């Protein structure tokens, strides 16, 4: 892991460095050293796209330099990891992969899909006689454990195969941005800003590689696969206010009809924290989570239009780069990113000091999930997440803090917030989601505030404060309309085993 936050100078691809990616974006996990000329396999994990993908670019560069063919592989994670993914997330994932597979075929790029889990990757590598396996990066435990298992298998059974990991998700690679877990956005922002110009560069074209002449991928019956996987998953209805895939992601960013940067960026700075104005938000988080669009592409395009709305673009870049990549920093350096033990010591102490404080209201997880509390604003935020698949960012803070206030202790509060977030949010099971819950409940990336019952020194939020910031009644009415439309539509479509939520609320 690089010990400093400043990366080495950028070098152009060449015999000594055939990769188009910045050298510090790549980690050599296992050097290998055998099978020269064997295919290069890109194991796609988090970054499910062909365009603007540093991991794919790195793999293609290696293949081109050795006149070797290139293949892409994706393995669906088995249970228990997928137990926390419901029909909502799995449907989006698979429909995106279906589009990706078609795009890969159009480029004559073999795409291997496995349903038996990451354990199938080493077997593919051995069958193909691959020289190098390239994986993209995720800081989450299940993905890191899967990568460790694959590397361990290859070290035992095919030690000549090199294994590289490329951070294709962050503008500044997580291990380069900082060598430690950062305390706050301020400290992280300072480090990232120093090297931003070195990494925020335009993507090159994908290097040309020799035609594929090895084992062909098995055909996939996508309709059957989607139906089977979704039928086995918990029935949280899919959404359709955003379509999966790279083309839809670019349309959401730059579309002439309703693109964020082309049509809506101007109001971002002033309206993004108003839950009654959801169109002020980018709507890009599902695409960023599933890797259908590169954050670097979003940042590059935002910089191009900064002269039109500098304050809004700067605010967007703060969220897109600093805050989002700070979440990866936390999850990378703190393995207990979803536990009270992952909080700073001051936060753990103050929460435990007040864990036995009397609560005015105590709700069960079932009551919270069904939005059965005394607070109509909180109920609305929960219903927005259930029916829309995305809760407004400002409301997520209020929502999580009230869970701390209304459950028996901080551990229960955090586990409940993460459970509900991962179940209903289309971008659940994401570093930003874990950090959002940790910020609200455990004071992560925040400071201590005036001590009070239950919260201790954790920042407090209440109904009156929300009422001063936005039209609470308008938000509640908006969500009621959403929920009513969704329930009606689901009732009409209930014979269909794969139910979707409408785009009418977007």
From Swiss-Prot:
Residues that bind FAD: 268, 282-285, 319-327, 390, 421, 427-429
Free-text tissue specificity from the UniProt record: Expressed in proliferating tissues. Highly expressed in roots and shoot apical meristem (SAM). Expressed in leaves, flag leaves, and panicle.
Pfam family, one: DNA_photolyase
Modified residues (Phosphoserine): 312
Biased composition (Pro residues): 1-21
Cofactor annotation remark: Binds 1 FAD per subunit.
One GO CC term on file: nucleus
Gene Ontology terms for molecular function: deoxyribodipyrimidine photo-lyase activity; DNA binding; FAD binding
Location in or out of the cell: Nucleus
Induction: Induced by gamma irradiation.
Known EC number: 4.1.99.3
Keywords: DNA damage, DNA repair, DNA-binding, FAD, Flavoprotein, Lyase, Nucleotide-binding, Nucleus, Phosphoprotein
Record-stated family: Belongs to the DNA photolyase class-2 family.
Name the record gives this protein: Deoxyribodipyrimidine photo-lyase
Organism lineage: Eukaryota, Viridiplantae, Streptophyta, Embryophyta, Tracheophyta
Gene that produces this protein: PHR
């Amino acid at each position: 892991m690089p010990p400093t936050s400043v990366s080495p100078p950028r070098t152009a691809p060449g015999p000594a460095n055939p990769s188009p990616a910045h050298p510090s974006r790549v980690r050599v996990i296992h050097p290998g050293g055998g099978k020269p000329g064997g295919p290069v396999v890109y194991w796609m994990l988090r970054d499910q796209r062909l365009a603007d993908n540093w991991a794919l670019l790195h793999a293609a560069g290696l293949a081109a330099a050795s006149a070797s063919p290139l293949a892409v592989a994706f393995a669906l994670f088995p249970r228990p990891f997928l137990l926390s993914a419901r029909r909502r997330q799995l449907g989006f994932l698979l429909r995106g992969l279906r589009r990706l597979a078609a795009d890969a075929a159009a480029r004559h790029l073999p795409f291997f899909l496995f349903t038996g889990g990451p354990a199938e990757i080493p077997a593919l590598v051995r069958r193909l006689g691959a020289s190098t396996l390239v994986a993209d990066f995720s800081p989450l435990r299940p993905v890191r454990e899967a990568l460790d298992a694959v590397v361990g298998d290859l070290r035992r059974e095919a030690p000549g195969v090199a294994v590289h990991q490329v951070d294709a998700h962050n503008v500044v690679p997580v291990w380069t941005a900082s060598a430690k877990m950062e305390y706050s956005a301020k400290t992280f922002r300072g480090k990232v800003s120093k090297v931003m110009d070195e990494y925020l560069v335009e993507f090159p074209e994908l290097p040309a590689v020799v035609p594929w002449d090895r084992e062909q991928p098995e055909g996939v019956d996508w309709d059957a696969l989607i139906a089977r996987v979704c039928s086995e998953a918990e029935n949280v209805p899919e959404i359709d206010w955003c379509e999966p895939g790279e083309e839809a992601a670019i349309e959401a960013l730059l579309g002439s009809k309703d693109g964020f940067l082309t049509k809506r960026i101007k109001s971002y700075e002033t309206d993004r924290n108003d839950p009654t104005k959801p169109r002020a938000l980018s709507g890009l988080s599902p695409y960023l989570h599933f890797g259908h669009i590169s954050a670097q592409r979003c940042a590059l395009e935002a910089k191009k239009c900064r002269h039109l709305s500098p304050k809004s673009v700067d605010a967007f870049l703060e969220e897109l780069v600093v805050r989002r990549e700070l979440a990866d920093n936390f999850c990378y350096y703190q393995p207990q990113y979803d536990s009270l033990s992952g909080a700073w010591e001051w936060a753990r102490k103050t929460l435990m000091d007040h864990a036995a404080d009397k609560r005015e209201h105590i709700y069960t997880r079932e009551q919270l999930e069904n939005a059965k509390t005394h607070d109509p604003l909180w109920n609305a935020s929960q219903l927005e997440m259930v029916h829309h698949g995305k809760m407004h960012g400002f409301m997520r803070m209020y929502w999580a803090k009230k869970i701390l206030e209304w459950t028996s202790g901080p551990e229960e509060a955090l586990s409940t917030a993460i459970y509900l977030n991962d179940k209903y949010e289309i971008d659940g099971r994401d570093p930003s989601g874990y950090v959002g819950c940790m910020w609200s409940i455990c004071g992560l990336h925040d400071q201590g505030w005036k001590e009070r019952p239950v919260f201790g020194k954790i920042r407090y939020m209440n109904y009156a404060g929300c009422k001063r910031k936005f039209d609470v009644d308008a938000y509640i009415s908006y969500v009621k309309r959403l929920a009513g439309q969704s329930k009606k539509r689901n009732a009409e479509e209930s014979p269909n085993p794969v139910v979707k939520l409408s785009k009418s609320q977007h």
